[in-house]
């Protein structure tokens, strides 16, 4: 499997890298939180732009991106508009979604954008090609907040993301029981062992699935999400506790 080097981190090598989300509503809240990350074990910051009150005014989005880049120094930025159909704050038309993501990449301030893989193949390809042309990378994603699909279906979705040209495929699913967590972990191992030529991100959500956020180095998930302030999904641990556990597991391997 190939690793991905972005700024000062290498994704896919060593312990899973920690992504910390920012879910502020106002520009002041967003930038204030970003300025607290000096003392936080964060490898990448995800700006959940769907929470931003002015998300549909691109000049204001660009202002925040510029100030985020200044505040975060060399920490990579992932910009994510999580749509309401996949658990996000707002709905958006596919063409507007494409424009937002490509224009964000063209600013030069973001390192990754998140693209929901089931937005429609034509739109997804347009975004991936546009983001790559701008010199940024893509995390393709899929979220099921209600269930855990069959192992074969999880692997199919991750392979589709890879085949579409995403730099990092990502899937998050909701367990109904402990066996569902095993299904997610088994799918992760299968994908990494048999199909993946790039890093992937997988997780089982909520308290039942929290182990999946910790054992990525064992099963093959290269990044994990931790909360510095407000969690953006069920089951996210505090970033300091998460970092401690990841370090302990890494030293034992």
Where are these predicted regions, by residue range?
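Short amphipathic alpha-helical surface micro-motifs
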Residues: 1-5, 60-61, 183-184, 206-207
């Amino acid at each position: 499997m190939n690793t991905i080097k972005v700024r000062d981190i290498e994704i896919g090598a060593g312990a899973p890298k920690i992504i910390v989300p920012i879910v502020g509503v106002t520009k002041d809240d967003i930038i204030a939180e970003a300025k607290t990350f000096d003392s936080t074990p964060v490898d990448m910051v995800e700006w959940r732009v769907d929470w931003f009150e002015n998300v549909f005014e691109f000049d204001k989005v660009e202002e925040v991106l510029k100030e985020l880049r200044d505040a975060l120094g060399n920490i990579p930025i992932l910009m994510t508009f999580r749509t309401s159909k996949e658990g996000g704050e707002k709905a958006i038309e596919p063409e507007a979604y494409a424009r937002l993501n490509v224009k964000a990449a063209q600013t030069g301030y973001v390192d990754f954008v998140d693209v929901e893989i089931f937005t429609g193949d034509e739109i997804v390809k347009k975004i991936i090609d546009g983001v790559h042309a701008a010199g940024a990378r893509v995390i393709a994603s899929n979220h099921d907040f209600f269930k855990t699909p069959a192992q074969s279906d999880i692997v199919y979705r991750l392979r589709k993301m890879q085949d579409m040209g995403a730099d990092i495929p990502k899937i998050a699913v909701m367990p109904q029981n402990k066996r569902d967590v095993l299904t997610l972990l088994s799918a992760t191992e299968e994908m990494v062992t048999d199909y993946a030529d790039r890093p992937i991100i997988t997780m089982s959500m909520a308290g039942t699935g929290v182990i999946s956020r910790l054992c990525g180095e064992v099963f093959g998930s290269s990044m994990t999400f931790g909360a510095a302030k407000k969690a953006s999904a069920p089951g996210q641990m505090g970033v300091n506790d998460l970092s401690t556990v990841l370090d302990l597991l890494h030293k034992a391997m």
